[in-house]
Amino acid sequence: EEARDLAERLITNMAEKTAEAHGMTAEVKVTRGYPPTINNGGFVDLVETALTKNFGQGAFARDAHPRMGFEDFSFILQRYPGAFVFLGTAPKGVNPLEAAGNHSPYMEIDEDAMANGAAAHAAVAFEFLNHGMGGGVDGAD
């Protein structure tokens, strides 16, 4: 939220000062939509542990690049520790990095992957209920 506040202040200031320099006024209205989706680091570690234990090395990969997406789940992550995780569903023989995205009309999925998704959720829940998050977050253990 600090970054959003700063961006709003800077944009407002720039608009007002630019307008003032030209003998005008400016009014900036910002409508805030969804908050950013920010995973809890401790919960990401828990997910990695659960998926590696249950599906083996290579079943979990951290995305090194932040994404600008937003999601209803963001509201939950503001209140509770958690992690937004992508499930690989590209059809066999298709490079996941080249597959059409979730909101594309060209998206195809390997429906067998859905069972893995359900099993992954169960594995994460089992790991959390049996081991918690190692004391990293209030209310998470």
Question: How would you describe each model-predicted region?
Answer:
Residues 1-141:
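Metal-dependent amide/peptide-bond hydrolase catalytic core
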